[in-house]
Amino acid sequence: MLNRIQTLMKTANNYETIEVLRNYLRLYIILARNEEGHGILIYDDNIDSIMSMMNITRLEVIGLTTHCTKLRSSPPIPMSRLFMDEIDHESYYSPKTSDYPLIDIIRKRSHEQGDIALALERYGIENTDSISEINEWLSSKGLACYRFVKFNDYRKQMYRKFPRCTIVDSMIIGHIGHHYIWIKNLETYTRPEIDVLPFDIKYISRDELWARISSSLDQTHIKTIAVSVYGAITDNGPMPYMISTYPGNTFVNFNSVKNLILNFLDWIKDIMTSTRTIILVGYMSNLFDIPLLTVYWPNNCGWKIYNNTLISSDGARVIWMDAYKFSCGLSLQDYCYHWGSKPESRPFDLIKKSDAKRNSKSLVKESMASLKSLYEAFETQSGASEVLMSPCRTFSFSRTEDTFSTSVINRVFENTGTGTYHPINDIPSLFIESSICLDHIIVNNQESNKYRIKSVLDIISSKQYPARRPNYVKNGTKGKLYIALCKVTVPTNDHIPVVYHDDDNTTTFITVLTSVDIETAIRVGYSIVELGALQWDNNIPELKNGLLDSIKMIYDLNAVTTNNLLEQLIENINFNNSSIISLFYTFAISYCRAFIYSIMETIDPVYISQFSYKELYVSSSYKDINESMSQMVKL
């Protein structure tokens, strides 16, 4: 089995091989090392992320295990309550999602019946979901003629003597609960099909759910510590045996992982006497250090670990940053070299426990030298970033791309006197992130050549982006930027599926799309019905000048330490769907996707095998490389 997976990893550069590898990852976790000896845990949920960061064919497969788990996720974002919008039809009235739909109905009826309106104004009514309680209130106010009657009871001829009664159709809707529809016209009424939506767009547009980006960047911290966790191979899978810190202590324990972790946590608690938050800086820590500790994390130790955050029972927080995400793909030694510190080799992970125990003194010494180099490099990079990317501080972000892009946007806003806002609540954040599609859309599995946009920044820097707060609109306005909840119907003819959906058998579905993606989809032949949108009436001017200013400042700082990093950033910027500027990313990704589709329009669809927002896979047999393809680079 191990030999089979080692062979697959060495040839994992095509779709078919990667899919076979995924099948094994449903059963096993792969233990691998990079060329510098850093351990990497590969499982089914993180293989795509790893492939986006490095060439996995160059990894050394050490073993397989079922004794290691993936990252422990943060407590999930509460699911947005499913939403039904108000429908006011000549035959019926269906209130929007509410805890008290009967109250909404009586208030709606008061618009037509002045005596109900007068009673509501004079006496008010308590919230209730009980028909009998509402009828009791109506009777006490001399309004029994408007009593509420269930549709089924009315059809049984029980209430014909109340011609002015309020007839309601009652139902229970999954994930929402009891719902009622006021039937205005019995002769024409049929129970409607009501769209149950994942978001209430009008709620999401509320001002208090949005904050200006610049006000969210003013953060400070007290202490930064470099850290590395080292793991050895045992019969029960990998186990951590050493945790090194700089400046700080090194903890070694071959007999009890629990005591190793507890000693480390006690030390952390001791150094947090003057601050509530510290920053731990690792390298590729999200791929090995953190998931390995998560497996062995002791219960009732006073700390919880969620992804890259440690939270104590008294509210103290430790943020574990991965400096690799700020390196633009450099190895640890290259990263240290580029930021002016002396590159030092680190101890190899996933060695035999007996070897680690025998060489523990030299491993501790080697680890401390490597961590000192990492610490100095990160401090230098952070200092440079604070100057070049003000007011953005490295520790406030998870990746260089986020820091750089936020700095550019903020600089443009400062120069124009405008500002942009980001969601500060889980629900609008989830709505924005739902519009970001990073997936590869598979058309077919033919052997293909891979092309990538030469410069994503060139494409996105000349486009428009939202400024100020959004407004709610039922349907977006052509020519303005908006993000809409959409009911999408796929074309009946053969087409390239430009709108991603995870169920190929569904022809109609609800999803979140930007105005840019909507325009692209309509060109392909999709039918789009907008069910509510966030619309921005103001745009920021193009980013090109601000971008060029930022690039020039970085180049002018120090050609030795920054140019190579910047060139990699410009050539291969990556977006994600979780950032303070996710609103910017969602439109940037849409612009790139529109560009990719404009190229696909010039190619016979039979030659297209798959694509993403910045990559295109074209059949190896395709020879007609046209002018538009000159803006792509073959990988």
Curated annotation (Swiss-Prot):
InterPro entries: Poxvirus_F12L, RNaseH-like_sf. It is found in: Virion membrane; Host endosome. Induction: Expressed in the early phase of the viral replicative cycle. The keyword Disulfide bond does not apply. One of its GO terms (biological process) is microtubule-dependent intracellular transport of viral material towards cell periphery. Belongs to the orthopoxvirus OPG056 family. This is Protein OPG056. The gene is OPG056.
